[in-house]
Amino acid sequence: MLLLAAVAASIALGSRAIPLRGVYDALTCPDGWPLTCAADGSTAQIVRELRLPRTGLALVCGLALGMAGALIQGYTRNPLADAGLLGINAGAAFLAALSIHLLALTTPAQYIWFAFAGALLAGVAVFGVSSVGGGKASPLSLVLAGAAITAFLQAMTNVVVLLDGTALNTYRYWVVGDVAGHDPSVFQQVLPFLIIGLLLALAAGPGLNLLGLGDDVARGLGVNIARNRALGLAAIVLLAGAATAAVGPIAFLGLIVPHLARAWTGPDYRWLLPYSGLVGAITLLIADTLGRLIARPGELQAGVTLAAIGAPFFILLVRRRKLVSL
């Protein structure tokens, strides 16, 4: 019910409030029948062409980032981990900025594939570097490799944006993180990757429960540790990479959402993963809607709104409750 309420509010509220009856008519009435509908032509255009694609993008990206955050915290055993820890955000940012600089791309629909490729390559690089030497990617080696690759990619991104003022202007809008102003094709481009990532994440849940007992115990119970970690990292890269490429790095979402979901489901990842996706979708929808209402008739980007709300909330969460050991 809360998800439906968040979706309805996202479509109905903004610089111009639309009654729910008007939203319903705009979605259901065929063109050419204005006399029988409460929605006029401009209302139908706002709902169908602006708010509905925006709401859909927020829904799927919030779901993806929430599930990716739960997976990252589980595999790294770090309750403060998110997509930035594995270099995914930095990889997406670097290739997005580089493509803007070299190819003069200006819209998210144009550079989304480069951002996704950057996230994918960064995730593979982190997994590869963390596996060097011991032959397996332990939680500690994943964190260290992610930190090193993130620092390198951030430095390269800074070089690109400082060399090109146009790239800086386009990049700084994307890097804030927002679901507004995206062509509907962006939703269609990322949806297949998000679906595949969702299925991989759900498949990785049972094995992740056993990995939480320790590698030796999990191995004794018959878990193929390398295969399970590879499955989980593939899900993380697809979910977080596609969502970040589409809307930019959304701060705090992948960090806070798993803790909220864990309060309802407990540590069982078979339930934690879908609930994290549900809470992530609701959270991003609410943040986007609040951003439209707070600065009306303008708006605040969802990334700014979520950071402003999420930072004090997370501090309160840490002070009132001890973080669950992962």
Which role fits each region the language model picked out?
Residues 1-326:
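Alpha-helical transmembrane segments in inner-membrane proteins
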